[in-house]
């Protein structure tokens, strides 16, 4: 069988094997993993002499591991595995061996041995560490660990055991953690002293003999120190050995691999400091270890001092030392935050903080961002501590300036692009993203500095910005773009303390001193020659700042023309990223300054003309794949068009300013509209033939037309009817837009994209056409709600129609009367369509709710008569039936609750005047619909009991209670409209028919007659729960 398993492994992992044979081999091996006796064959395969090939031995041992972890090997058999492996280890690792196992096999054996440790160390292999330590000696006569192979394997297992039971980053179940804690206790009790002694012996014996052994040993010390007695590591013998390894940092040249030993030695000190202990003990430990001196010596070592700013600079060591600094300062600050530490400890901690401040600044200002990022946590903790102290005692703020100012200057300096950066280079997108992420972290630290000492922050940033603009004035385009970008970035962040409620001003005065300074900065920036902003990054920053602080221009209107001119240059920028972003920023700027722009429409339309040409591009295959980066997406055809829409909106905004005469508005609008109309006409025929590019072109055209309308009026339907429509001649021009869109929609209504664009245009045209659009409403509905329209589309259009009803309730009755029946028939068809998945069900629920919302909009806006008009009377019963169905839906409480709301509103609208004593439902009184009172009693009232009568109904469910409260509201409405007739019906028919007892019936009727609406809504859910 051994030969059979070996052959199967060879076939499975041989690239040239026949695929069918390979599949059989894998099936066989998978069966072997679950076979209770399979591990025995594989253990024999692994330990066999002469040895099988590496892949056979690796897979064989993997099967043994798998069986052990799956519980296929009982404790007695685990002892057999232990004995077999230990015999193998003594043969191969217990003596000099010319052909040692490769690292992957060593790791696999260590993994198996670690599992056996977990299973048997408590009971069955108490001599575990003695057995492994025996491998580190060549023979009985050896007085110190002298067997290299055995030492490496021993350390491999020691590190593996830490990973298994000591690593705090590994997620464990409660049971696993309890077992790990138990094993750690046993180690501490039985073997920890001899393990620590073995480390000392190995480091002493091999300190210069084998870098791999020393590195592995240091890693073991560093990882185990967190959960063992600290004195086993922090003692003079061990510290001397550690300092010997740290001395490697002073070498100008290291042999290959030696740097790993040096870094591992530094990591041991970091782990010692990271060990949990009382604040006083931690501060004393930092002083005892003389970490300030250690860090100073490391910082002044050749790799970090002489080689700094050269290609030889050792970033790995810099990052390793930065971790030590970070860990130490975090603990110093943590001690200072404790209110109950002694005055002596606080004094020591403050002294350490002063000593470590240069170290923080050294690594924080390191030119490599990964080094800087390593000390950001401790810098943030320090600043948070200073903020807390300054709030408790403001008088200490000035004392902290010597700490704060150098940190703030370091933060600002680190915000600057370094000399090697090349902004916008496609090859550096990852670096750019990482730098922007670093800037965000630095900005948070900067805000904390400002919260500790705002004046210090204001002065520091003001100085940087003022100096930069002065240099710009003197040297112009010769100024390094990185310096200008830094100043602009700081200006952008400065608004966090200067801007209040979106403005720099309150009651025509600057908000505060920060706002005053920022206004000065803005003046310097805007009055600078834009041609000096030669780099795309600074040009983009310029626009972002103008938009963020647009309130500045409201008080400096003389500067607006110059800024507009700058923007009109930048919207033609050759860099796509800058150009497309500038289109959005231009729209934002003109929207915020709409009333102060002046009559510049002709200039703007002419300047933007070439950018308003719409060029639809079919997305290339795979453009939607997961591999597309955000940068790629910004440059995609779809993203570019979406940015282009901002230009159309900007044109609408500028052309509709009060300073532009109505006839000129029409002229400018027509100059934008006519090319789009011509393009639509040209593409309509091929689009009808399903030409993909033509369809997309018309989609883009319609979106552009709708967006232009949006620029003219930012009124959104649903707020109120447009209070200031454009001049009649302008509205007439947009009627052409509506007509052109409808023509395209009527021809291409089977296209989802065309319907989507048309729905958007419709919503925007309302704002410029007002009630003029109402006569076209039937055509819009016919085009937007087709046989192929999704439920989602119907729901969106219903929501839009609600807003139209609200905005034009005085003028829409006749049109609504004409279109209601065919419109609702399409909605009912959408509701009736079967669902095929979760997405369908979600869309169906949304459509139901929007349908009920539509009915409520009609009723709430005094248009209820349209539902029962002569034209729509035949549809009325279907309307009621759907509402009844929704009211009984136990799967959708939200819809059920709305259904009861609609029924209550119908009762209020058509039930006639209130006749019950003291009935006050707040509804406007309307003429009674003949027969509706009886209809409410016979059809609506029984619905209130349908849900609670359902076997699966849970009256304690929060949503269920809300539905029942709404049902109670309906009953109260019926009572208000019908009075004693309803009471009599309930007493004689409905309640007894449900099996309700006489006493409960009287209690229910008393509550209905005596409680107000709110009281009965609360009573009904309680009543049904009995």
Curated annotation (Swiss-Prot):
Principal location class: nucleus
Record flagged with keyword Lipid metabolism: no
GO cellular component: cytoplasm; nuclear matrix; nuclear pore
Localization, UniProt: Nucleus; Cytoplasm
InterPro entries in UniProt: ARM-like, ARM-type_fold, Exportin-1/Importin-b-like, Exportin-T_C, XPOT
Annotated transmembrane regions: none
Keywords carried by this UniProt record: Cytoplasm, Nucleus, RNA-binding, Transport, tRNA processing, tRNA-binding
Molecular-function annotations in GO: small GTPase binding; tRNA binding
Protein's GO biological process: tRNA processing; tRNA re-export from nucleus
Pfam families given in the database record: Exportin-T (PF19282), Xpo1 (PF08389)
Record SUPFAM superfamilies: ARM repeat
PANTHER family, per database record: EXPORTIN-T, EXPORTIN-T/LOS1
Functional note: tRNA nucleus export receptor which facilitates tRNA translocation across the nuclear pore complex. Involved in pre-tRNA splicing, probably by affecting the interaction of pre-tRNA with splicing endonuclease.
Family: Belongs to the exportin family.
Identification of the protein by name: Exportin-T
Upper classification of the organism: Eukaryota, Fungi, Dikarya, Ascomycota, Pezizomycotina
Gene: los1
